[in-house]
């Protein structure tokens, strides 16, 4: 019987993988004569091979039609953003009218808070996790100040209460219950960027809405990583980026979800002409008539060249399906966890929760001996063509992405850790 932690077993798993051919749909950076062993899809996804042709299609249409490309040609720019809408909805578990690709994550977060953070004298607090991504914290604090409120009194932070710096569901529930009468908004991540912890979003939404608070999600590390059910969960809004697991390129256009119950609401918003209903947009009337659904929060015409790579990537998600991607992801990350425990337990400590339901593909790792040794291992891996990433103060993040990573890649990683430890 083959050793389940051997390279031979990994090769057999790769050969039996129903998604194995998707790897060929991506361009890999090179290390010498070989592909890099790339575990950084949680920071920047690889380039889909089809992206170049789709960008060229836009460039060719621009060259051939100039301004007329907005209304004629194979992919009219007037409605180009809608070419990704249905596929995006499938990835995040939404109805098509609930999603739009626009702006960037932090811009969209501000737009959503302008509509959904409506503080009153009694209810003005915003609840976040204490380890929130800095841009989210900056956005929240600035929104509080715009309303004349002090973050010291109106920003509620849920501290990590588990040994590895993760947050229990009971701590979240307790904080929502304790501050419920004063909460205007709960803003929570789908996955914590440093620890890799995934959260029970449906339960967080239920608890927050029961207290009368609006609920928003930052899905930067969850979209394309976990199956999501935003419509059924009832979240008010969600924002995310497309340059990580959605492979749309550096600085890619962001994504936004607004629940269907708000599709035709009179919520105040920061308005722009591309959010005006499409049928009358070019009449240039002074009165703003919003498009129904998430498209009504658009400001300017979409960046068509930036949307083209997203189209290429979403076609691969449709080909694979989120359920199949998640099944492979659980296998990959579980296999990596087993190998770390079996072969390098004296070197690496896994920060990320062990339960598959509480993590995505990423494992966050600490190196025994502290930060200096952690940096030394990180730099050794990089020099060997094994790319993870580093998050201060002391975490190496390794994210096996099911679209393009193999079980044999995990062995390359562990073998390099062993080589470094033995040196």
UniProtKB/Swiss-Prot annotation:
Requisite cofactors: pyridoxal 5'-phosphate
Entry's EC annotation: 3.7.1.3
Single GO MF annotation: pyridoxal phosphate binding
Top-rank taxon, per record: Bacteria
Keywords annotated in UniProt: Hydrolase, Pyridine nucleotide biosynthesis, Pyridoxal phosphate
Chain positions found as N6-(pyridoxal phosphate)lysine: 244
Pathway per the UniProt entry: Amino-acid degradation; L-kynurenine degradation; L-alanine and anthranilate from L-kynurenine: step 1/1; Cofactor biosynthesis; NAD(+) biosynthesis; quinolinate from L-kynurenine: step 2/3
Cellular-component GO terms for this entry: cytoplasm
SUPFAM superfamilies in UniProt: PLP-dependent transferases
Entry binding sites for pyridoxal 5'-phosphate: 105-106, 133-136, 218, 221, 243, 273, 301
UniProt xrefs under PANTHER family: KYNURENINASE
NCBIfam families attached to this UniProt entry: kynureninase
Quaternary state and interactors: Homodimer.
Stated name of the protein: Kynureninase
GN (gene name): kynU
């Amino acid at each position: 019987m083959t050793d389940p932690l051997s390279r031979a077993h990994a090769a057999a798993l790769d050969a039996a993988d129903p998604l194995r051919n998707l790897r060929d749909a991506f361009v890999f950076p090179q290390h010498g004569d070989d592909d890099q062993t790339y575990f950084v899809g949680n920071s920047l996804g690889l380039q889909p091979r089809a992206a170049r042709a789709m960008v060229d299609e836009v460039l060719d249409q621009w060259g051939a039609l100039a301004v007329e490309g907005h209304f004629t040609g194979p992919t009219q720019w007037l409605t180009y953003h809608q070419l990704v809408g249905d596929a995006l909805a499938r990835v995040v578990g939404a109805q098509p009218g609930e999603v739009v690709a626009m702006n960037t994550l932090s811009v969209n977060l501000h737009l959503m808070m302008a509509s959904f953070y409506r503080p009153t004298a009694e209810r003005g607090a915003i609840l976040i996790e204490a380890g929130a991504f800095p841009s989210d914290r900056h956005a929240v604090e600035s929104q509080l100040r715009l309303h004349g409120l002090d973050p010291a009194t109106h920003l509620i932070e849920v501290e990590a209460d588990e040994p590895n710096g993760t947050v229990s569901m009971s701590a979240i529930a307790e904080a929502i219950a304790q501050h419920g009468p004063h909460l205007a908004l709960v803003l929570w991540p789908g996955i914590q960027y440093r620890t890799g912890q995934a959260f029970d979003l449906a339960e967080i939404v239920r608890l927050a809405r029961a207290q009368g608070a609006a609920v928003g999600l930052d899905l930067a590390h969850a979209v394309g990583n976990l199956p999501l059910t935003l419509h059924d969960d009832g979240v008010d809004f969600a924002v995310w980026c497309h340059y990580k697991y959605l492979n749309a390129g550096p600085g890619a256009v962001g994504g936004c979800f607004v629940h269907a119950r708000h599709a035709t609401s009179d919520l105040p918003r920061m308005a722009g002409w591309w959010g005006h209903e499409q049928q009358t947009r070019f009449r240039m009337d002074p009165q703003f008539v919003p498009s129904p659904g998430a498209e009504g929060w658009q400001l300017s015409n979409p960046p068509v060249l930036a949307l083209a790579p997203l189209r290429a990537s979403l076609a691969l998600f449709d080909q694979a399906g989120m359920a199949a991607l998640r099944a492979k992801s659980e296998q990959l990350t579980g296999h990596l966890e087993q190998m770390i425990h079996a072969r390098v337990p004296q070197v690496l400590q896994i920060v990320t929760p062990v339960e598959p339901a509480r993590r995505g593909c990423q494992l966050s790792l600490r190196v025994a001996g502290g930060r200096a040794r952690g940096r030394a291992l990180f730099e050794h891996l990089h020099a060997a063509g094994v790319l993870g990433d580093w998050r201060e103060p002391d975490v190496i993040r390794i994210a096996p992405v099911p679209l393009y990573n193999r079980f044999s890649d995990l062995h390359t990683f562990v073998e390099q850790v062993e080589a470094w430890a033995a040196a």
